[in-house]
Amino acid sequence: SYVLDTALSVNILGTVCPDMVKFDVFRRVNTGGLPLNPQEIRNTLATSEVRNLLKNMSSCDEFMKATLGGVNDVRMGAQELCLRYIVINSYYNWEKHDFNQYYGLTKSMDKMVLLLNTYKKSELESILNEFRVIMLQAHMILQGYSFCKIGQKRINTALFTSWAVVLYNMN
């Protein structure tokens, strides 16, 4: 049979393997079937607490109202948008109007997942609670426009991130 005639190669990534190497290996091996998108790869290396944080952020009522339910999360698109907000908000220095230790979006998002993996449950809950407040404020301000360019219904990730970071820093 086809299965029995197939040769398998197995690589074990042990605990001593650097985390950024794990991201790189996933990206290189990720070629068969339906390829994983970057957020799905990050999800494999996130702790259950971080996965729950992103899932809760992307499914909370405040986020749904602020985005008018316009972000599809079938392949973790909404979770990636929430992580993008955490990254930009963490790396952006509001006083200097500049980024601290920013490595480009993809690498910064990878690094943020690894950093969030080290957070205590109370720190992750704080991120979720702050996010809920920001999304409530965004909904009150933007109402039916929900992070969209005029005349469009699709959520603009840059507008979402910008508004969310500005609202966070206004508090």
Could you tell me what each predicted segment is?
Residues 82-171:
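C-terminal subdomains that position terminal phosphate/3'-OH groups for nucleotidyl transfer/ligation
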Residues 1-103:
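Basic- and aromatic-enriched surface patches that contact anionic nucleotides/nucleic acids
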